[in-house]
Amino acid sequence: MFAIQSENYFVDNYSVSDLMMYPCVELNVEAAPTATTRSSEKSKRSRTAFSSLQLIELEREFHLNKYLARTRRIEISQRLALTERQVKIWFQNRRMKLKKSTNRKGAIGALTTSIPLSSQSSEDLQKDDQIVERLLRYANTNVETAPLRQVDHGVLEEGQITPPYQSYDYLHEFSPEPMALPQLPFNEFDANWASSWLGLEPTIPIAENVIEHNTQDQPMIQNFCWDSNSSSASSSDILDVDYDFIQNLLNF
């Protein structure tokens, strides 16, 4: 019992003695934040205010090179009357700004492309379907009602009308065949052809059926062969015939 009371008494005395012996502890605790704020104010750097000319030059250099070497950074700082650290920080901030803008644009593009086609109203979809059905019906009816043209083979043989897939005989159309002339056999040859064509009197009488049918089968070379032994044709007769023929030509 007494031990417990003594312990309680000791605790009470200790707590009271601490409060009485160290009365300035609270003052030190209150003074500590003021010292830290003063040190932070001293360490806080001032914000750099760039002029319009400096910003234009920095932006121009950023579009050319987003990352500067130290030699180039020193040149820019000397030309714009800035410190090397200011130029370095400005480029860092500018790169972060560009990165944020590109990420934002990419997010907006992803949202626009991710919109499903089902977002359209059902009425618009029905209208589109109806238009497609009408077009299909119109196309089918035109195909069915169009009659198939039957090509006349007789006309095609003459070379007047030809389908596009068939070869066209231009030579046959534009250069027709020569006019056929009647060909008379040798036995029916008119001996007085000059008199009939030129209007002259016949000099040699026409003998009918002079050449027999059996001689037609023989070659024509035998008719033109000259028989040296035959004396049927004399030189005087030949000269008379030739003279009369030449005289008729001269009179014409």
From Swiss-Prot:
The keyword Nucleus is assigned to this record: yes
Record-annotated DNA-binding residue ranges: 43-102
Full protein name: Protein zerknuellt 2
Database matches in SUPFAM superfamilies: Homeodomain-like
Gene Ontology CC, one term: nucleus
Recorded GO MF terms: DNA-binding transcription factor activity, RNA polymerase II-specific; RNA polymerase II cis-regulatory region sequence-specific DNA binding
Keywords: Developmental protein, DNA-binding, Homeobox, Nucleus, Transcription, Transcription regulation
InterPro entries named among the record's database cross-references: HD (IPR001356), HD_metazoa (IPR020479), Homeobox_CS (IPR017970), Homeodomain-like_sf (IPR009057)
Gene Ontology terms: biological process: positive regulation of transcription by RNA polymerase II; regulation of transcription by RNA polymerase II
Keyword Transcription regulation found: yes
Subcellular location: Nucleus
The protein's role, per its UniProt record: Required for the differentiation of the dorsal-ventral pattern, and does not appear to be involved in the process of segmentation.
Taxonomic lineage of the native organism: Eukaryota, Metazoa, Ecdysozoa, Arthropoda, Hexapoda
